[in-house]
Amino acid sequence: MKDREAISELIAASARQLSREHYNDAQIEAAIAHVFGVDSNLIEDGSYFVAESSDGLIGCGGWSRRKNLFGGDQYSARDAGYLDPQSEPARIRAFFIHPAHARKGIARAILSRCETEAQTHGFRALELMATLPGIAFYESCGFRKIGDYDLELTVDVKLELVPMRKEMRHPQITQITQTEKT
């Protein structure tokens, strides 16, 4: 995929700039090396989206019907098996926004597209693994924390993450009309 290198660069820039208040340099660099990265399954499944502007790629994110909750191709603990939409939540995956375009509605637009597509495929709930800088955004979109998770990246480096969940409403109403008198 031609966007793969640009997505990788966006992920690294986003992690390095937007995570500084929550993680130290060792955590950020280890996360980029071992976890944060392009997930080929999302691209192959057609469920990974990019936002573009005249500046190039400014955001990316996706959803998945696969069991893997987080991690790019380089992450060793991946599970590419499929979820059952009747009993398991779809996954929200790999959201990264270019630092120059953060907090401008890009992630919200991508998330809205992901929610709609997951619902279209029969899913009734969503789960994700949030980094600390993403928690407030996901809470503002209706997700709630369901635990805590410390990911061991190296012998000396751990990354605090937060699993989150959202129950989806019924498909949105597209039109309400007045009934005619008979």
Please place each PLM-identified region on the residue numbering:
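Conserved G/P- and acidic residue-centered "switch" motifs that form tight phosphate/ATP-binding loops
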Residues: G105-A107
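Active-site beta-strand termini and strand-to-loop segments that position acidic
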Residues: E52-S54, K166-E167
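Short, intrinsically disordered C-terminal tails of secreted or membrane-associated proteins
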Residues: E180-K181
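A short beta-loop-alpha structural element at the N-terminal edge
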Residues: M1-E9
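Conserved GNAT-fold acetyl-CoA-binding loop/helix
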Residues: A12-V38
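C-terminal "cap" of GNAT-fold acetyltransferases
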Residues: R124, M129-I135, C141, G147-I176
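Conserved acyl-donor/pantetheine-binding loop and adjacent beta-alpha core of acyl/acetyltransferases
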Residues: D45, E52, I58-A102, S112, ...
